[in-house]
C-alpha cells in the first residue's frame, strides 16, 4: 500500500519545527571486521578442504621410499541470498509535503534496512556458533570441541569448560590456538588476530588487553598478554551479538570466516503509470559463513 498524505498529516500545514525518530548516527560497519570479504560472480561459491602429507618416516638403507597421498575432504558452500525492500508514495504526498524530501529520506531508510539485515545475518554466524543445529562442511557447529580431522582424530576451537572472559580463559584459548594442527595433525603457526565481543564485555576486554600489570590483582606481575603482544589491543565489538557472555578470538587462518558480495547495494526508482505513485526499491545479494573453523576460537561463557 502506498504511503499517502494521511501518512504525514503534520507535514501538510505550517508550524512544524522538526522531524525525529528516523535518522540517528550509526555504528561503523562491523561485519567486515569479523569476516574476510570477497566479490563473487557465480551463483554460489565453494571451498574444499585439501590435505598435504604426514611426517616423512626414516628410510632404511636400500629400502623403498614410503608413499603417502594427499586428498580432498569436505566442502563448504556459500549460497547467495537476495535481501531487499520497497515502498510507494503518492504524487500528492510528494507534492504537498512542506518540510522534507519524503522520497529521498525514505530511500535512505531503505538502505539502512538492508545494512541492518547484512549485519544481523553476519552476527548470527557467531550467535549460532555453539548451536549443533547450524553446522559447517565438517558436520560440526562453528565452535566445537570435536571437529574431525580428515585422517583421524579431532581438534577443538572451543574451551572444554565454558568460561567467562577473563585473564585465565583468554590465556587458555591462546594456548589452544598456539597448539593448533592441520588435518594431517601437523602443527600450524596460527595466531590470534582480534578479540570479538558483545557490548557488555567492552570494559572487561579493555582491562585485560591494556593493563600494564595483571588486571584485578594486588600483585606486581606484568600483564603477560600485553607484554608478549599476543593479540595487541584490537577489539571488535559486535552490536548484534545476543549472548552477553559469549566471546571469540578471530585468528589469521586463511579461508575461514567469509562474506561474498554477489551484488552490492542497488537502488531503483520508478513511477507507476496508472497511479502516478513513486516507487522506490533497494536490494543486495550476498552470502556469509565459514570454511575453516580454525578461523575462530571462543567460549559461550559460564
Predicted regions and their residues:
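Structured all-alpha helical bundle cores of eukaryotic regulatory proteins
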Residues: 128-152
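N-terminal alpha-helical "arm" segments
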Residues: 1-27
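Short alpha-helical segments and helix-capping/turn motifs at coil-helix boundaries
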Residues: 19, 71-72, 180, 265
